[in-house]
Design a protein with these regions (language model features):
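Cysteine endopeptidase catalytic domains of the caspase/legumain-like
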Residues: 1-292
Length: 292
């Protein structure tokens, strides 16, 4: 743990994606006749990032196949329940690798979701290392995620935003093809450790109830697979639809199948309907890797 160092902010990673996304979305808001699709939104982000000298390629991952040629949303149009959000911005004030734009990211994204998507301040939890909000420690971040999904019900839409450093740690569970877990780096990472993708998956992703929607924006290094989801769209200018991620761990899919069955209270047919397409692709890809 002590050997991990925050990356040099000159690496031009912190906050770039949030800014690019908001630029694209506010441009669309100012031209209401032009509804952006997921593809247009992510490719618009990529163009803005490249124009500013950034190398990131925006990605969308999902627990199910999403038609990326449909309109982009943070809260789905059919949302009938409560809209909640957890927004985290860490500048690592006073530490090596200090960032400067993550607090602004949170303030800007908060204004956007309230102004455009109808989120109410009372349902927005903010964690920032500014001395005014709840400190973004490891414990506080995980608690915020756990509280968010604990309160979610059918018809609700929740949004999580993280702007800060991301990292990698050696995988100890054997579920990562590249041998590394992607991580979020909390303020107290030296004392408490980083937050692994497995932690996020277990406390956040698997706890979302049936009929509710969770959308996350992770603006940090190594964030492409930090939620450990099976479907992926990469805005590289060549893809036009979401694909099954062949690096996805088959065990996670089995867990999702079990979760679906639990949600439907033993209704195996309903559970199978949720995961059958994913299972078919996952098993095929997994067998190809195992027996090639």
């Amino acid at each position: 743990m002590a050997s991990f160092q925050l990356p040099d902010p000159a690496g031009r990673a912190g906050g770039a994606c949030t800014s690019a996304l908001l630029n694209a979305l506010y441009a669309e808001k100012n031209a209401p006749s032009k509804d952006l699709t997921w593809v247009e939104t992510l490719e618009g982000m990529r163009k803005m990032l490249r124009a500013k000298g950034y190398e990131q390629i925006p990605q969308l991952t999902s627990s199910r196949m999403v038609d990326v040629n449909q309109n982009f949303y943070i809260a789905p149009p059919n949302c009938t329940g409560t809209r909640r959000a957890v927004l985290i911005g860490i500048n690592y004030v006073g530490q090596q690798g200090q960032l400067s734009g993550c607090h602004n990211d949170v303030n800007n994204i908060k204004e956007y979701i309230m102004d455009v998507h109808g989120f109410e301040e009372k349902n927005i939890t903010v964690l920032m290392d500014d001395g005014k909000h709840t400190s973004p420690t490891r414990q506080n971040i995980l608690h915020a995620y756990e509280t968010l999904v604990k309160n979610m019900k059918r018809g609700d839409a929740s949004f999580c935003h993280y702007s800060g450093h991301g990292g990698k740690l050696s995988d100890t569970s054997g579920d990562e093809e590249d041998g590394f877990d992607e991580t979020l780096v909390p303020l107290d990472y030296v004392q408490a450790g980083q937050i692994k993708d497995d932690d996020i998956y277990n406390c956040l992703v698997t706890k979302v109830p049936e009929g509710a929607t969770l959308t996350c924006l992770m603006d940090c290094c190594h964030s492409g697979t930090v939620l450990d989801l099976p479907f992926k769209f990469v805005a590289d200018g060549q893809s036009s639809e979401m694909q099954f991620d062949e690096a996805f761990d088959i065990a996670h899919l089995i867990n999702l199948a079990g979760l679906a069955q639990a949600i439907f209270k033993g209704d195996k047919a309903a559970a199978i309907d949720i995961v059958k397409d994913a299972a078919k692709d996952a098993v095929t890809g997994w067998l190809k890797k195992k027996f090639k």
